[in-house]
């Protein structure tokens, strides 16, 4: 998944070290080689079920603040249809793995959800969008890495396939392009805030994997 222009290229360059940490963290390495403990995966998935509700809410709030109608419609579509992709995968694993419902969000997932919602409500619209982008771009890149390196008959293949599917790719490409456009037309102060939000979002992606591997 390539950047859409100079601004998103700069964003990815900034976050590249965090991405390297993600694909080399214990959770992702063991997901890739098929040795991920079931306990870690069920913990992660039970938390992710709660997280995507707030992620969807943050997308909807950000959509309401969009300056262009096409961006508003896209973010609303993403809040529903894009996350339906994840819910379908969650439902399948929950049914087959008998995953218990988490009573509340864990510290790492709560911090991530709060970060997205705070930006959605209170940051300038371009910054809110940049904060949400890692949930798709970094997640896609991580899934792409796992897909290319996963062993045959990986027990978590459905999770892996979800984030390398064409529908998820198209949503992510469009989101990157929107962020590129927003970065190109705004001032340097907002661009810096967008960069900071994107980096923090990527770090939250890392933190939820690290938390799951400590269970």
Spans of features found by a protein language model:
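Long hydrophobic alpha-helical segments typical of transmembrane helices together
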Residues: 184-215
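A non-catalytic, amphipathic alpha-helix used as a structural packing/dimerization or gating element
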Residues: 43-54, 77, 81, 193-200, ...
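Short alpha-helical hairpin
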Residues: 12-36, 55, 176-185
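Active-site-proximal alpha-helical scaffolds that flank and shape metal-associated catalytic sites
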Residues: 2, 70-170, 199, 203
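Short, charged, low-complexity loops and linkers
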Residues: 1-9, 31-42, 121, 154-162, ...
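Hydrophobic alpha-helical segments
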Residues: 2-9, 15, 19, 115-118, ...
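Alpha-helical bundle segments that constitute or directly flank the non-heme di-iron/ferroxidase center
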Residues: 16-21, 35-65, 85, 130-140
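Acidic interhelical loop/turn segments
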Residues: 150-156, 180-192
């Amino acid at each position: 998944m390539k950047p859409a222009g100079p601004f998103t290229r700069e964003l990815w360059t900034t976050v590249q070290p965090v991405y390297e940490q993600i694909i080399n963290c214990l959770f992702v390495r063991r997901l890739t080689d098929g040795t991920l403990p079931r306990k870690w995966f069920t913990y992660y998935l039970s938390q992710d079920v709660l997280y995507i509700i707030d992620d969807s809410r943050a997308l909807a709030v950000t959509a309401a603040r969009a300056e262009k109608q096409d961006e508003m419609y896209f973010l609303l579509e993403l809040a529903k249809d894009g996350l339906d992709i994840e819910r379908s995968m969650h439902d399948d694993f929950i049914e087959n793995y008998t995953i218990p419902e988490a009573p509340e969000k864990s510290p790492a997932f709560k911090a991530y959800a709060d970060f997205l919602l705070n930006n959605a409500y209170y940051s300038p619209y371009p910054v809110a969008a940049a904060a949400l982008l890692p949930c798709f771009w970094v997640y896609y890149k991580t899934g792409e890495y796992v897909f290319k390196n996963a062993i045959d008959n990986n027990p978590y293949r459905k999770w892996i396939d979800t984030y390398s599917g064409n529908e998820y790719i198209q949503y992510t490409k469009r989101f990157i392009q929107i962020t590129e456009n927003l970065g190109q037309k705004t001032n340097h102060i907002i661009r810096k805030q967008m960069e900071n939000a994107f980096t923090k979002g990527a770090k939250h992606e890392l933190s939820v994997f690290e938390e799951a591997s400590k269970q």
